[in-house]
Curated annotation (Swiss-Prot):
Organism: Helicobacter pylori (strain ATCC 700392 / 26695) (Campylobacter pylori)
GO biological process terms held by the UniProt record: one-carbon metabolic process; tetrahydrobiopterin biosynthetic process; tetrahydrofolate biosynthetic process
Lineage of the species this protein comes from: Bacteria, Pseudomonadati, Campylobacterota, Epsilonproteobacteria, Campylobacterales
Subunit architecture: Toroid-shaped homodecamer, composed of two pentamers of five dimers.
HAMAP family, per database record: FolE
Record protein name field: GTP cyclohydrolase 1
Signal peptide (residue range): none
GO cellular component, one term: cytoplasm
Gene, per the UniProt record: folE
Residues that, per the record, bind Zn(2+): 71, 74, 142
Length: 180
């Protein structure tokens, strides 16, 4: 890692021995371990260990779960909120497990579209609800800092499975809950 940063500093015309940069390779290495720890965790385990047989058969919504991730195209952050709604069949999941699922997938090099799909597919596979919906809203620093340089653009993605995909009233109920 140190050689990588020494070459990087040299390529941009920076002095690798400058006081403020001497410890940067070590600091960044520790930061990257934290930012990308999602590769060392199994998102399925996070859900499998946190569900129980439920008595609820109505919609459950976890709204505005904050996340940050790193765009795999430019290695710049994107951050925002994810909301997950589901209609249980037999299993109900602890709300913190939904946040953990989001954290595991977002702590990887990502694109927003895949992040949204992975959350929905894993939830659907492990919890087996009658329906699941995932809505992700994010600001991409790669869009703000370079290229088109649009500071206030918000990108929204969604994935629908089961009743949310088949029934427009169910979708509308979820969207109304997000607004209230």
């Amino acid at each position: 890692m140190e050689n990588f940063f020494n070459q990087f500093f040299e390529s941009i015309g920076e002095d690798k021995n400058r006081e403020g940069l001497k410890e940067t390779p070590k600091r960044v290495q520790e930061l990257w371990k934290f930012l990308y720890k999602g590769y060392k965790e199994d998102p399925r385990v996070a859900l499998k260990s946190a569900y129980f047989q439920g008595v609820c058969d109505e919609m459950i919504v976890a709204q505005n779960i904050e996340f940050y991730s790193t765009c795999e195209h430019h290695l710049l952050p994107f951050l925002g909120n994810i909301s997950v709604g589901y209609i249980p069949k037999e299993k109900i999941v602890g709300i913190s497990a939904i946040a953990k699922l989001i954290e595991i997938y977002s702590r990887r090099l990502q694109i927003q579209e895949r992040l949204t799909i992975q959350i929905a597919e894993t939830f659907d596979e492990i919890i087996e609800p009658r329906g699941v919906i995932v809505v992700c809203e994010a600001k991409h620093l790669c869009m703000s800092m370079q290229g088109v340089q649009k500071q206030n653009a918000i990108i929204k993605t969604s994935v629908l499975r089961g009743l949310f995909k088949k029934d427009s009233k169910t979708r509308a109920e979820f969207m109304q809950l997000l607004k209230s």
